[in-house]
């Protein structure tokens, strides 16, 4: 199902200029990951991260996430780019960060945020479409075990949990509320609505 991407019209000294909404957000150093993660999506996100670093390596990048996860290899490509660039990457989950997207949320190199009703889910990598000769299946299974260990080590590094705890908790889908994600170490802070926060401070 396709949907229309909104355009924003801005006035410049040369007249009107239109941007698709994602390009306009990029001007403010905002990258939005709002789809399942595949190779094409990962390439776009990585390109945006590299571009923003080249623009100003000292300014933070804000990565907003609303994704059910997806390809492990594609997600690890985004993860490596986040760790590679000099610009700090703040991550914020809006809606959902599940599976590979939860790892990217936790791996923010700046601040890591969740909106109040966001959900976070971690689990072990899934095998799909496995077939062929027994030897090929054995090779795939060994690679899957290595990937499971790698993902657990990355989550442990960024959450402060032990690898053993991560492995145990990801045996099945582990869903968390925004506050539970803070307590688990995947998120630093829950962002509450600005107006209510400012009223309560009076």
Curated annotation (Swiss-Prot):
Its EC number is 3.4.21.92. The active site is at residues 99, 123. InterPro entries: ClpP, ClpP/crotonase-like_dom_sf, ClpP/TepA, ClpP_His_AS, ClpP_Ser_AS. It is found in: Cytoplasm. It catalyses: Hydrolysis of proteins to small peptides in the presence of ATP and magnesium. alpha-casein is the usual test substrate. In the absence of ATP, only oligopeptides shorter than five residues are hydrolyzed (such as succinyl-Leu-Tyr-|-NHMec, and Leu-Tyr-Leu-|-Tyr-Trp, in which cleavage of the -Tyr-|-Leu- and -Tyr-|-Trp bonds also occurs). Keywords: Cytoplasm, Hydrolase, Protease, Serine protease. One of its GO terms (molecular function) is ATPase binding. The keyword Cytoplasm applies. It is an enzyme of class 3 (hydrolase). Belongs to the peptidase S14 family. Cleaves peptides in various proteins in a process that requires ATP hydrolysis. Has a chymotrypsin-like activity. Plays a major role in the degradation of misfolded proteins. Fourteen ClpP subunits assemble into 2 heptameric rings which stack back to back to give a disk-like structure with a central cavity, resembling the structure of eukaryotic proteasomes. This is ATP-dependent Clp protease proteolytic subunit 1. The gene is clpP1.
């Amino acid at each position: 199902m396709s949907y229309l991407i909104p355009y924003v019209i801005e006035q410049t000294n040369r007249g009107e200029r239109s941007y698709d909404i994602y390009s306009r957000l990029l001007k403010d150093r905002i990258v939005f990951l709002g789809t399942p993660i595949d190779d094409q999506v990962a390439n776009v996100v990585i390109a945006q991260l590299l571009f923003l670093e080249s623009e100003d390596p000292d300014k933070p990048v804000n990565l907003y996430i609303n994704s059910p996860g997806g390809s492990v290899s594609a997600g690890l490509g985004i993860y490596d780019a986040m760790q590679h660039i000099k610009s700090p990457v703040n991550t914020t989950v809006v809606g959902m960060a599940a599976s590979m997207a939860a790892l990217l949320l936790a791996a923010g190199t700046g601040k890591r945020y969740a909106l109040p009703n966001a959900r976070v889910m971690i689990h072990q990598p899934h095998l799909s479409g496995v077939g062929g000769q027994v030897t090929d299946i054995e090779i795939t299974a060994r690679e899957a075990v290595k990937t499971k260990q790698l993902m657990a080590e990355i989550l442990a590094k960024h959450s402060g949990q032990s690898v053993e705890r991560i492995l145990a908790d990801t045996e099945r889908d582990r869903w968390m509320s925004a506050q539970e994600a803070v307590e688990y170490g995947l998120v630093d802070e829950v962002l509450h609505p600005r107006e209510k926060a400012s009223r309560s401070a009076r």
